[in-house]
Amino acid sequence: GREVSVLSFVDGKTIRIMTSAQDHKRAKDGDQGLNTGGMGTFSPSPFYTEEVDEFCKKYIYQATVDAMKAEGREFKGIIFFGLMLTEKGPRVLEYNARFGDPETQVVLPRMKNDIVEVFEACVDGTLDQITLEFEDNAAVCVVLASAGYPLAYEKGLPIEGLDTFKDKDSYFVFHAGTKFNEEGTIVTNGGRVL
């Protein structure tokens, strides 16, 4: 089946689902090459239908929060649901207590809410008073990786062209495997760079 990622905010008792995303894990075009931490993603996923959403809300999302609380593990924060869409319905592949990368890069820019208010509601246990809203558009993220990733790759190579994105609305450059060198130039410092 298809994999879909869904991020959520949790305050210990209430869960608020963000919009869906779908990432591409293979290092090369055409779903070829080794698995990676993610080479790109888009949101929303066309495979995360209203029917899938209803199923997950009924059997997965709130049930997860309730089960954690029942076990004495009340959770506040972010839950990332890695789902597999099968003929028998959605199945949970993984849970992560963090934002997903690169899924977050296409989900949060579409969110209309003030994220600080949402985080405060998670901490205060008032998430039930928040309704998440998202732009009615799509977002795409393409990861720029060092040659050779996910195996061997060079570090310390200068990155050029970042000024191209200054003053561009709705364009973002998210840094991952980068750093400033001794001269103050942004250089590569990992496999998934931007």
Question: Where do the PLM segments sit?
Answer:
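Internal nucleotide-binding/catalytic subdomain
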Residues: 1-107
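Hydrophobic side chains in beta-strands
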Residues: 8, 85, 144-145, 175
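Hydrophobic alpha-helical transmembrane segments
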Residues: 17, 167-171
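Short clusters of hydrophobic/aromatic residues that line enzyme substrate/ligand-binding pockets
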Residues: 39-42, 159-162, 173
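Short, well-ordered beta-strand elements within core beta-sheets of diverse protein domains
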Residues: 41-44, 142-143, 193-194
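Active-site "cap" helix and flanking loop/linker of ATP-utilizing ligase/carboxylase catalytic domains
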Residues: 57-79, 96-168, 176, 181
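A structural signal for short secondary-structure junctions
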Residues: 87, 134-136, 166-167, 186-192
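Internal helix-turn-beta structural module
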Residues: 170-194
